[in-house]
């Protein structure tokens, strides 16, 4: 009797659609299919754009139950790159992000809200410059499917604005904030 109940339970579990369960992904930084970019005003006349070259993370995503999705990212702040070595050295210094003391920034989601049509609000705790604050990333599901190497992938884009004072970072020139743009592609585990 126990064997037949076990077999029945196993058969039911195997018959459940795979889409009914969240899938876990590793962010594809090795294949350069993900980026964390920033844009900050330069003296109020133009913008400086840059990126963080080194980061890692993972996410769990279920199209049928968005609220169960999760995101975790770790950014190496010493990898900040604005395509200008002297400026990068200054931004990484104690005058601004103090990457020597705070070499990592982390984001851990606490809530994902489905806004419809592939749009999501991803709220979580960002730790930057030794300060942890809640932020919301306005994200969009780009798509998911098989890749040419036999794996499965899912991709998202997102934006958020960070107020520097919220993280005890001095104002950079005339800008009190930095705009972040995220391109995230994950490979299913």
UniProtKB/Swiss-Prot annotation:
Residues 1-22 form the signal peptide. InterPro entries: Lipid/polyisoprenoid-bd_YceI, TTHA0802/YceI-like_sf, UPF0312/YceI. It comes from the Bacteria. It is found in: Periplasm. Gene3D superfamilies: Lipid/polyisoprenoid-binding, YceI-like (2.40.128.110). The keyword Signal applies. SUPFAM superfamilies: YceI-like (SSF101874). SMART domains: YceI. This is UPF0312 protein VPA0850. It comes from Vibrio parahaemolyticus serotype O3:K6 (strain RIMD 2210633). The lineage of its organism: Bacteria, Pseudomonadati, Pseudomonadota, Gammaproteobacteria, Vibrionales.
